[in-house]
Amino acid sequence: MEYTVGESGLDAAEFIAFACRIWPADYDLQRTRAALSRTINLTAREGGALVGCLRILTDGCFFGTITELLVLPEYRRRGIGSALLRLAREHTPTMLYFGAQPGLEGFYERNGCRPSLSSYVIEPRR
């Protein structure tokens, strides 16, 4: 497994194809490209193929948030998510916040994360 911190050249089309295998959606290529350019991208690759990704949005000083931690289903339970979290902790100067999907709290706690703020969402008006 090859891990990269700060993969600024992460291809938007590749990321969309990867993300759709986990969270199927109609992702916009240009918006995805813009989003990837604004985050610290940590990747896990096997044979050059993207199999895991953790993205961090940060001001570089006070606050950072993990926007997502994604690992392809067939690569889960191999330590990839744990390795990406460890790299995030080692390469981010800020405290990291994130929301966890229900049922995954144990994974995060085993990886040294602790419960913090309650999460809320403001949905865009349609």
Model-flagged regions — what are they?
Residues 34, 39-54:
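Conserved beta-hairpin
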Residues 71, 77-90:
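Conserved acetyl-CoA-binding loop-helix of GNAT-fold acetyltransferases
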Residues 85, 90-103:
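Conserved GNAT acetyl-CoA-binding A-motif
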Residues 95-99, 109, 114-126:
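Conserved catalytic-core motifs of GNAT/GCN5-like acyltransferases
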